[in-house]
UniProtKB/Swiss-Prot annotation:
GO terms for biological process: adaptive immune response. It comes from Homo sapiens (Human). Gamma-delta TR is a heterodimer composed of a gamma and delta chain; disulfide-linked. The gamma-delta TR is associated with the transmembrane signaling CD3 coreceptor proteins following the stoichiometry: a single gamma-delta TR heterodimer associates with one CD3D-CD3E heterodimer, one CD3G-CD3E heterodimer and one CD247 homodimer forming a stable octameric structure. Upon activation, gamma-delta TR complex associates with FCER1G to initiate intracellular signaling. This is T cell receptor gamma joining 1. The gene is TRGJ1. GO terms for cellular component: T cell receptor complex. The lineage of its organism: Eukaryota, Metazoa, Chordata, Craniata, Vertebrata. Keywords: Adaptive immunity, Cell membrane, Immunity, Membrane, Receptor, T cell receptor. It is found in: Cell membrane.
């Protein structure tokens, strides 16, 4: 599992 910060949108994509 890892969390990748989506720059520009300011949201976080959570991939398990």
């Amino acid at each position: 599992n890892y969390y990748k910060k989506l720059f520009g949108s300011g949201t976080t994509l959570v991939v398990t």
